[in-house]
């Protein structure tokens, strides 16, 4: 039996690289080298069956993994980043104390090319777990008229943070995630 240690698994690196992108007034934070042990998380993801059963997210086009782990160790980091780069108006501790370990598992053929918002308030965060040779595309951001403003490229152990009301869509070049290759990213909704 495999045992899970959240303190080790979800430990954050002490030397992340932070970059605030500005897409025509839209702020998107990119943090590289986010987790100290991303290989442990990736191994856990690859060893967990993903499902199309998504009753809490009925419009999600792909599969996901949704497991209850203790993510409270992420609170201090997210509070700091949100207050530093955005307006802190959510209870991060409360959100992450109830948040599950949610992983989007998507292939090119099942992706929805239409930009969407996640919610009208709060923040969303994606953390990529595809290794370098698997990475393709990224996350596209749009204005309210569906004009593309910019792309954040997919990169292993990269965290992207943005407000949930911002229109976005996974950018996956045609045929990039097929067969046994899936786009895998941890997703957090804070707020």
Each model region followed by its residue ranges:
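Non-heme Fe(II)/2-oxoglutarate
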Residues: 2-98, 110-112
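Catalytic core of non-heme Fe(II) oxygenases with the double-stranded beta-helix
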Residues: 100-191
């Amino acid at each position: 039996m495999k045992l899970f240690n959240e303190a080790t698994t979800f430990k954050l690196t002490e030397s992340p690289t932070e970059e605030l992108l500005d897409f025509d007034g839209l702020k998107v934070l990119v943090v590289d080298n986010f987790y100290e042990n991303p290989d442990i998380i990736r191994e856990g993801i690859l060893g967990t069956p993903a499902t199309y059963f998504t009753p809490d997210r009925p419009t999600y086009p792909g599969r996901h993994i949704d497991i209850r782990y203790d993510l409270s160790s992420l609170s201090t980091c997210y509070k700091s980043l949100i207050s530093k780069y955005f307006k802190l108006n959510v209870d991060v501790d409360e959100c992450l104390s109830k948040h599950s370990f949610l992983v989007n598992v998507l292939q090119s053929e099942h992706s929805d090319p239409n930009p969407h918002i996640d919610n009208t308030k709060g923040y969303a965060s994606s953390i990529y777990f595809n290794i370098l040779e698997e990475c393709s595309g990224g996350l596209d951001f749009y204005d309210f008229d569906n004009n593309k403003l910019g792309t954040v490229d997919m990169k292993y152990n990269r965290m992207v943070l943005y407000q949930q009301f911002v229109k976005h869509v996974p950018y996956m070049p045609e045929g990039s995630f097929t067969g046994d290759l899936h786009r895998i990213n941890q997703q957090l909704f804070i707020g």
